Amino acid sequence: MATIFFIQPITEEAEAYYPPSMITNKRKDLGVDVYCCSNLVLQPGLNIIPLHIKVACEHMGKKCGFKIMARSSMCTHERLLILANGIGLIDPGYVGELMLKIINLGDIPVQIWAKECLVQLVAQGDHVPDHINILKRNEIFPLFAPTPRGEGRFGSTGKAGL
């Protein structure tokens, strides 16, 4: 059985960057790059960026969590950007839109261009994905069915602990 990422655009804007397709990970890259779907200007300090996609990950036929990790292109000589929480951990039951909290550590705004990749997705257990399945925007897909975890965003699962 394989490790598969399922990506579904949720806006017309995202459809242009995520056309329906099944991509085979021939290079066996660990991370799946995620596009910015519009031009953005990140002000100094904290910025919240919607990615306009839903994502699910499946390993050995079972839904699993995944991580959002910075790509090396996020921090260059021209810009100093970091993920606010270091690594984003996405629960298997989360079915909402992916969003980023990015901190611009510089003193000036930073331009991000559409189709630029700042982050990548890595399957729980660091399993190399075999396929990336890009779904149609309005397609009904079982892995995005409502769950007790739901679509609650940053910090929505409550207090520390289980």
UniProtKB/Swiss-Prot annotation:
EC number: 3.6.1.23
GO cellular component terms given for this protein: host cell cytoplasm; virion component
MF annotations from Gene Ontology: dUTP diphosphatase activity; metal ion binding
Biological process according to GO: nucleotide metabolic process
Chief location: host cell
Record localization: Host cytoplasm; Virion
Catalyses which reaction(s): dUTP + H2O = dUMP + diphosphate + H(+)
Family statement: Belongs to the dUTPase family.
Quaternary structure and interacting proteins, as annotated: Homotrimer.
Entry protein name: Deoxyuridine 5'-triphosphate nucleotidohydrolase
Highest classification ranks of the organism: Viruses, Varidnaviria, Bamfordvirae, Nucleocytoviricota, Pokkesviricetes
